[in-house]
Amino acid sequence: MQLVALGLNHHTAPLAIREQLAFPAEQLADALRDLTGSQTAHEAAILSTCNRTEIYASARDIDSVLVWLARNRGLDVEVLRPYLYALDAEATARHAFRVASGLDSMVLGEAQ
């Protein structure tokens, strides 16, 4: 297992794509159970706002997370691929701190 992040945001995807990948609050618990129960990820967190959807996971590999995301949202992997970023362990940690501090937000410092 390795630490990975897979996501898209206001920099990488138009609103129409972001809306298709967004996880409503009432779906998050089931999505996390499915993600970790599918053997794709040992542990995971999903961050979903109007400006980003990101999956942080301890996973076998990033491609398995991508396949799970596409299946869960009912989309084709190849439709999603151009809009997504995939990060390795070091880049995942750096990115998580940028997001948490609001440095990667549409408006600097906001919580989205």
Where in this protein do the model-derived segments appear?
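N-terminal ligand-binding/catalytic initiation module
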Residues: 1-112
